[in-house]
């Protein structure tokens, strides 16, 4: 995705002018404007993570949305984040969506979050933890958004049934091809769910993603970069998936409980996802010692709001994969693959005096081939202005 880096001197003036222009125009155009401020501190960088060691700007958002007319609505989301001492401005969403198609169909076009999985189409500030699960960071770069189109259908019934198909450029998931397929990614997703009385509800989904530009291949030793340099701008930080392949399959399940249906007082959410990535390498790369065509990962998490202002969350996840630096030198190859597995356990405690402000403390234990690590993190997530309801 296109990223604009702006200096500390310029950014304050740029956003002050932008905010003044937006607020003036919004009064006339009846545009909903929302801001999410996200900042954090952590004692070490996370494996495949996106946040710097120490203090950093997390995933702060400026959201503009409005109905265009009775046929269309639109939304634009820009994100500010800091990586390696630089501040990045990124356009995360810029889409239009139909409002009047018959029979429960909707068409969305532009830059949008893919509808695969449970977490991917949610904004990062909705999460119960500072970073997405390791399997999301490894296979989707945290969350996958792209330029393309999405067609969805919601069944007109009490039983929840929604399906969607998507076509995207695939650039964020490109393994480094010099002439990639222009429409490189196709996805499909099916979700079902229901309420069980007033206290319980559940949702189950299956997803599939085809990535025409996802198979990794051997680069020459004289190349300026390897297959994934464009995903890693600095060591330890990911701006895209660490692992790509041609086929990605996933399934997710979520269950929610609230005594007497009162989510404001006490509630519990349990969710889990499993992802399987296949066809990772082209034939030449597949013959490298240690190569494995499949990688897989999963996580399970529980978030329990035991008081109106307090939530305790815990999550465990794993990724099983091989990693290596392989390149061609003349008529032979250099390098090999070795285990790159990661196990991760998180515990977080949130204080939230309202729906719009949250302070989080988190402890993470990572176990991988490079050694074990314990991370301590603090985060604030504050929002003001228009704030739309969160999805299930």
What are these model-derived regions, one by one?
Residues 58, 90-92, 169, 184-186, ...:
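Transmembrane beta-barrel architecture of outer-membrane proteins
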Residues 29-173, 180-198, 301-322:
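Outer membrane beta-barrel
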Residues 41-47, 82-86, 115-119, 157, ...:
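Gram-negative outer-membrane beta-barrel proteins
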Residues 1-9:
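N-terminal secretory signal peptides that target proteins for export/translocation
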Residues 199-335:
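Detector for outer-membrane/organellar transmembrane beta-barrel domains
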Residues 251-253, 351, 372-392:
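Outer-membrane beta-barrel "beta-signal"
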Residues 12-23:
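Bacterial N-terminal signal peptides
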């Amino acid at each position: 995705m296109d990223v604009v880096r702006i200096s500390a001197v310029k950014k304050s003036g740029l956003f002050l002018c932008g905010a003044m222009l937006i607020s003036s125009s919004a009064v006339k155009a009846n545009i909903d404007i929302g801001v999410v401020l996200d900042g954090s501190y952590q004692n070490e960088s996370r494996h495949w993570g996106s946040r710097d060691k120490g203090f950093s700007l997390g995933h702060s958002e400026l959201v503009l949305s409005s109905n265009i007319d009775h046929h269309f609505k639109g939304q634009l989301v820009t994100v500010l984040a800091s990586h390696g001492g630089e501040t990045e401005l990124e356009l995360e969403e810029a889409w239009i969506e139909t409002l009047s198609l018959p029979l429960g169909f909707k068409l969305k076009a532009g830059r949008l979050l893919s509808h695969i999985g449970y977490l991917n189409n949610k904004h990062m500030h909705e999460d119960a933890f500072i970073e997405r699960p390791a399997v999301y960071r490894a296979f989707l770069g945290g969350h996958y958004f792209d330029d393309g189109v999405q067609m969805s259908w919601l069944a007109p019934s009490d039983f929840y049934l929604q399906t969607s198909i998507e076509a995207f450029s695939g650039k964020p998931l490109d393994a480094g091809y010099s002439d990639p397929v222009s429409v490189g990614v196709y996805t499909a997703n099916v979700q079902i769910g229901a309420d069980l009385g007033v206290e319980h509800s559940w949702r189950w989904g299956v997803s599939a993603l085809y990535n025409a530009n996802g198979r990794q291949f051997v680069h020459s030793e004289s190349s300026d970069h390897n297959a994934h340099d464009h995903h890693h701008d600095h060591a330890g930080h990911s701006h895209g998936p660490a692992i790509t392949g041609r086929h990605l399959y996933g399934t997710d399940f979520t269950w929610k409980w609230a005594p007497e249906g009162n989510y404001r007082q006490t509630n519990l959410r349990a969710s889990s996802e499993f992802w399987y990535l296949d066809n990772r390498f082209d034939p030449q790369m597949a013959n490298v010692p240690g190569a494995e065509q499949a990688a897989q990962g999963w996580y399970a998490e529980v978030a329990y709001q035991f008081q109106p202002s307090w939530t305790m969350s815990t999550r465990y996840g794993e990724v099983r994969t091989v990693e290596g630096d392989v390149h061609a030198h003349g008529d032979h190859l250099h390098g090999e693959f070795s285990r790159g597995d990661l196990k991760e356990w998180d515990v977080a405690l949130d204080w939230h005096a309202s729906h719009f402000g949250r302070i989080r403390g988190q402890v993470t234990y990572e176990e991988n081939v490079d050694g074990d690590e314990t991370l301590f993190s603090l985060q604030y997530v504050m929002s003001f202005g228009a704030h739309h309801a969160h999805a299930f």
